[in-house]
Amino acid sequence: MSPVAGPSTMSLELRDLRKSFGKTEIIRGINLAVPAGERVGIIGPNGAGKSTLFNLISGRFEPTSGDVLLYGQRLNGKKPFEINRMGLSRSFQITNIFPKLSVFENLRCGVLWSLGYKYTFLKFLADLDDANDRAEELMRMTKLEKKRDILAVNLTYAEQRALEIGITIAGGASVILLDEPTAGMSRSETSRFIKLIKEVTVGKTLLTVEHDMGVVFGLADKIAVVVYGEIIAYDTPDAVRADQRVQEAYLGSSVADQQAQGH
């Protein structure tokens, strides 16, 4: 899905974004500008507001104030499916697939939904061949071609996450949000999955929320550190690792510890 041309050279922009629940402000004036094709890791302690931020970007929550822009187009007030068809897609922390459908059927559903399938029989027939071809392509991209007719419920956890990645990119979105994509995986599965993410998101803008520092520092071009609903640092992995504010607020020795353990 090609982005609609807009006045901005940035793929995604957050401008003084705020979100309150009752009297509690969870997101406190976040500003972020992400160039097309950049990979951004979002880290921070539990309760920092990372998932809320993803929900604001993807349209699940409406901002209290501020703006979310996709290639210069304001997303405020748009529903998640509208945002998806504008070129932004997300995966969730909890695997979000159709367990009783096969791998192929899951991917085909993702393709048809992204096409704006209107549930009319003639349009369904017209779209079906293209959707089948795209689903086959997605199976190859996610290394699931040998699992084509296996029900999703019978896949390993890592395979289910790969399937969800396939569904997420099914419509060709240019901006991808991944929420803890490697959570629950073994070290070897994580290593393979990072490689898969890099392969299937080539040329795309990627934002990833992740607690595994090895994943974040190995995947991201830039890292945004969120603490108490604010971005306290946004820089390259090396610069963030050396930032005293980040170490005091969040990282401490965790990066060094994880790297020493081989993460």
What would you call each of these model-derived segments?
Residues S2-H263:
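Glycine-rich phosphate-binding loops of nucleotide-dependent enzymes
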